[in-house]
């Protein structure tokens, strides 16, 4: 189920002195089953872009196609689109409202007019997918830890059984362990064939999890490629206020000191493996 942008521009408050072009002639295609990371400076259009992917926003000009459905067409039933494309906002736990975890996660499936048995199946499955014990279903979501509450919010989206999952800074405010757990969950969804789009300010996260990385700047597509292709262009990223993953910075420092580090090192695991390889080579060279 590809998502296609065709020359999309979006203007907030058009026709007023406060008009602002948040997207400017964006064209791209997100293929089925890929994990995309979206990065860019504050105000670059990242959130506006993803809100076009399930019809929360419509283009001022251009077209957005999701599974062949034209989201620019006012006749398109956006409910069908939102059942296929799940969107998880920043701090989604702030949107929890059900008296119980079950009631919260069941909200979406019930709005799809599903039978009680199917709703229960989806809720139980979604809780298991986010690593929560289904036996928790009768607990209040408001007594959970931040990481658990975020999992409940994520389960509420997964219960709709979308084919595309879009996440806007899903680890914001979590401790390192909570961050890793959420990202590992999302990475697991991608490995099952789900299309995942992750908006993040963390270069390390997109380097580790994304198949492709989109860089937005001033509402336009600034760069697009694999993590190692993009982070090899460090000077261009720094020119627009972005950094590189810690592993890339470390690899650059080691190369300056004469270490033979491969050019495609972008994650810390890859950096460790490369360093071990160099050290093993030196140890072998020192043997009589």
Curated annotation (Swiss-Prot):
Family matches, as NCBIfam families: ECF_ATPase_2 (TIGR04521)
Protein name: Energy-coupling factor transporter ATP-binding protein EcfA2
Designated gene of the protein: ecfA2
Cited PROSITE patterns: ABC_TRANSPORTER_1, ABC_TRANSPORTER_2, CBIO
Amino-acid positions noted as binding ATP in the UniProt annotation, renumbered to this chain: 40-47
The EC number(s) this enzyme carries: 7.-.-.-
SMART domains membership: AAA
Purpose of the protein: ATP-binding (A) component of a common energy-coupling factor (ECF) ABC-transporter complex. Unlike classic ABC transporters this ECF transporter provides the energy necessary to transport a number of different substrates.
SUPFAM superfamilies: P-loop containing nucleoside triphosphate hydrolases
InterPro entries found in the cross-reference section: AAA+_ATPase, ABC_transporter-like_ATP-bd, ABC_transporter-like_CS, ABC_transpr_CbiO/EcfA_su, ECF_ABC_transporter_ATP-bd, EcfA2, P-loop_NTPase
A family per Pfam: ABC_tran
